């Protein structure tokens, strides 16, 4: 391992940004960048200091004595897991059927427990003891885009969809079998209105009346945490009426949230180039993310046509001071919902790395979230994901309502008896 590689590894182990390392050792940020690029070498004393600090931090690693244990269903690429781990939890079981999503998940969470595929094949006895059931159950059957598409094709949707709609009931099956103290479910905002509200009524009826949980719901807009207008519904259930209320959680001001400048590649040499997203000494965004003349003309013509009809279809063009639209799983097709304005030439798409930042997977002072898949798959995966810091906030909000006994010998989990 070269000195440059060691410095980067040490920094990532400590979950620190280059600027934070700069403050720690008393050298300017540009010098830290040069160290990691191998263009200069730090003094031996500085390198030894970083080694010692990293060693001390890693002797008390998180999740060794977790505050609670949780299972991650319909796990996707691990956004719910990241948020719950940041709240002090430990994942003990994962279920995700999509091979590409699983590839990304396993690249970031090396296996230390069973990883199941099809949830319909999971038996209750296959799942280890846990305190919280976490599930972002498949959202497409209930999303506005998904319903419109299925209606146009004459296909069933929601709970009538044989491939995905009934998967909520697989969640209910495990809740009924295990009776965990708490569950948290996440879905698209349109779940509330789907099928004139009947779908949501069935879900709440199952959770409250059939399973006997105290259930609380809230639609949360992520733009207080990340520069993206993204509304999702969170459904939290407690086995006992614990007195929980979303009103007691502290959410950031949605009118004072971050802007896109906080997640865009700076292209000024202050970050290391990451192929294939950025390149060169200044780490400029690769030209492949710039729209071709043909695609840019098509998007402009398409927007003009629909504006004349009085509807809102069209591209979204944004700059560093803006907040973006919702990143969707179809972003890989043309990137039209979030295009980045450039001083010269056609606009560009976000890179997958910027998408990771936009969804809160990459945060200051933490190692890069690994993206081992193609751009097409990455766009789909981040578009289907949750915003990590939103999940973290909700997860921390339930902690006071969980029992505190969490030793290996006495987990909170209690199986159904009788």
Residue map of PLM features:
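A short, Lys/Arg-rich alpha-helix, primarily the initiator
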Residues: 1-13
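Conserved hydrophobic/aromatic packing and binding residues within compact polymer-binding modules
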Residues: 7, 21-22, 32-35
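C-terminal target-recognition/interaction regions appended to catalytic cores
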Residues: 18-21, 28, 43, 287-418
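Recognition helix of helix-turn-helix/homeodomain-like DNA-binding domains
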Residues: 26-41
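DNA major-groove recognition helix of helix-turn-helix/homeodomain DNA-binding modules
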Residues: 42-60
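Core alpha/beta nucleotide-donor-binding catalytic domains of modification enzymes
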Residues: 57-179, 189-193, 198
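Class I S-adenosyl-L-methionine
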Residues: 122-132, 144-326
